[in-house]
A protein has these predicted regions:
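N-terminal secretory signal peptides
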Residues: 1-13, 21-29, 38
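Conserved beta-strand positions in repeat-built beta-propeller and related beta-rich domains
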Residues: 70-76, 107, 113-121, 158-163, ...
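Beta-rich, blade/repeat-based domains predominating
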Residues: 53-69, 96-117, 141-158, 191-212, ...
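A short helix->beta-strand "capping" segment at the edge of beta-propeller domains
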Residues: 40-55
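Beta-propeller blade signature
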Residues: 127, 322-330
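Surface-exposed loop and turn segments in beta-propeller and other repeat-based domains
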Residues: 45-48, 95-96, 181-197, 237-241, ...
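Hydrophobic alpha-helical segments and helix pairs
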Residues: 130-185
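Short loop/turn segments that connect beta-strands within beta-propeller blades
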Residues: 83-87, 129-133, 173-175, 227-231, ...
């Protein structure tokens, strides 16, 4: 899909196709054991899966207070919310014609659910009240290609654009609200590989403990550390296993990084991050798998478990298909 003409209807198939091509070009898979979810007895109060509305076509997931979750739709731009312990969902943000949501991130300071996506050919970043569903900010990103994921830091919202080699930044005020300024951009330089047309580059994004950013690359593979001030990007060396491929969403819990690889194998790669000689190093810890995973796109951590939303990209009947969240044991 050309970056200048994003299509809601073709989004899922195009996304799957781009990542699958990357996986086919790289035959290496993560070394280390694949951990099936065999420890569910430790969380008897939590379900193995959480049902989502049929036809939702989910992609982004984030978690709020307690066991509250939020999931966005790539097909109609709605956000649904519910409890990971079960009990159904409700619509937080109503659908809108032409709107497509991708990454979501809940900011506990403000109770806002931030979302990236598009309305037709326009790229947007939204802030939605996590209780009422009111849209408190709608930031137009001029020149955007394919906004994909985001992270909220102390003074900014950073977001990836999978078709452009840059990160976007929305300034926040001291209260964690949008400061009302136009987005700024930082070009990805250094070791970052150029993103070819009709492929996906930067995808998942999280903030490291030193204030730098970690991103993955859906086509070229690897984990990458970005200096947010200069854009200089260095690949994070992976030990005890080959570099990851086909990454989508990222989750960082302490020093453990989870790389969701839906189209690359329907699993979650696990890494232990540490600084060594002034650079970040990732030690492969294996993979999380489960029979109920079906092209997971993103995940969130809540109630001691990792929760992966199954986007099911490539399903022949996406507008009527069943969708669900899979619980995975953290390790």
């Amino acid at each position: 899909m050309a970056a200048s003409t994003p299509s809601v209807n073709n989004h899922a198939l195009t996304r799957r196709g781009a990542i699958t091509l990357a996986a086919a070009a790289t035959t290496a898979v993560l070394a280390g054991p694949a951990y099936a979810d065999d420890g569910r007895h430790r969380h008897r109060g939590l379900p193995d899966t959480v049902a989502l509305p049929d036809g939702l076509r989910p992609e982004g997931i984030t978690s709020g207070p307690g066991t509250t979750f939020y999931v966005g739709s790539v097909s109609d731009g709605r956000i649904v919310t519910g409890d990971l312990r079960g009990g159904g969902t409700r619509v937080l943000l109503a659908p809108a014609a032409g709107r497509s949501l991708r990454g979501l991130y809940f900011d506990r300071r403000t109770g806002l659910v931030w979302a990236v996506g598009s309305v037709g050919a326009e790229s947007h970043v939204w802030a939605v009240d996590g209780r009422t569903g009111a849209v408190v900010a709608d930031v137009l990103v001029l020149g955007g290609g394919f906004l994909n994921d985001l992270v909220v830091t102390e003074r900014a919202v950073w977001f990836t654009d999978s078709s452009l080699d840059r990160l976007g930044r929305i300034a926040l005020n001291r209260r964690g609200r949008a400061a009302g300024k136009a987005p700024t951009f930082v070009a990805l330089t250094g070791d970052w590989p150029s993103t070819a047309a009709n492929t996906f580059g930067a995808n998942g994004i999280r903030e490291l403990s030193d204030g730098s950013l970690v991103i993955n690359n859906s086509t070229a593979g690897g984990l990458w550390r970005v200096n947010p001030h200069t854009g200089v990007t260095r690949e994070i060396v992976v030990t005890r296993g080959p570099r990851p491929v086909s990454g989508d969403g990222l989750v960082l819990v302490g020093h453990t990084l989870y790389d969701v690889r839906g189209s690359g194998g329907s699993d979650v790669s696990v890494f232990r991050l540490r600084r060594r000689d002034g650079r970040w190093v990732a030690t492969a810890q294996g993979r999380l798998t489960d029979p109920t995973l079906d092209v997971p796109s993103t995940a969130t951590f809540a109630a001691g478990s990792l929760w992966a939303v199954n986007a099911r990209f490539g399903n022949p009947t996406p507008d009527t298909a069943s969708y669900w969240i899979t619980r995975l044991e953290r390790h």
